[in-house]
């Protein structure tokens, strides 16, 4: 879904979002789209131009709003007509877990907000570092999407919810990308 340009500009002017796309002020943020809510939107998606997530009511029902509120700040989604969506909620992570990659991964620190800008490469070689995993059934990924345990994955598959991609991520004791120094300098959330 396409985020409204004036809304994105306002988020930047109010120092809620950095030019790099990082959310600086972690709080509930309402999403304003420049289009109507469509059936073609994925059940777990993002307002384009931001890292603000959107969850469809079917995912919300499956995960439970109280569980979602444990790991996300929850807001509303408005369409181009400024009508609140009954289909989607907005979500801003309270914390992030980085999916890691190999030595080809890119890592830098945003000069403006100090966030780690990391992209795991090569594709399809991703993993999670053991010590970064919280004791939760699901939690936000710093890349995109939601990391879930096996039990939640079974529920998602059984639910029949369409248009959800998933991949089993190995859990490694240590990162193999050579970027630990980048992650040692993480700013507080």
Please state what every model-predicted region is.
Residues 1-189:
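Phosphate/anion-contacting hairpin/loop surfaces
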């Amino acid at each position: 879904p396409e985020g409204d340009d004036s809304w994105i500009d306002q988020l930047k002017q109010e120092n809620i979002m950095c030019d790099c796309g990082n959310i600086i002020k972690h709080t509930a943020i309402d999403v304003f789209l420049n289009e109507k809510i469509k059936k073609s939107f994925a059940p777990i998606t993002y307002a384009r131009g931001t890292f603000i997530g959107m969850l469809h009511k079917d995912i919300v029902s499956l995960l439970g709003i109280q569980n979602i509120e444990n790991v996300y700040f929850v807001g509303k989604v408005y369409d181009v007509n400024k009508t609140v969506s009954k289909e989607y909620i907005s979500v801003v992570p309270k914390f992030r877990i980085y999916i890691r990659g190999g030595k080809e991964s890119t890592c830098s620190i945003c000069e403006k907000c100090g966030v780690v800008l990391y992209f795991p490469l090569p594709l399809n070689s991703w993993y999670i570092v053991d010590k970064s995993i919280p004791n939760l059934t699901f939690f936000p990924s710093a890349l995109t999407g939601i990391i879930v345990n096996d039990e939640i994955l079974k529920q998602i598959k059984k639910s029949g919810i369409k248009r959800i991609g998933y991949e089993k991520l190995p859990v490694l004791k240590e990162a193999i990308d050579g970027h630990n120094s980048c992650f040692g300098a993480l700013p507080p959330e």
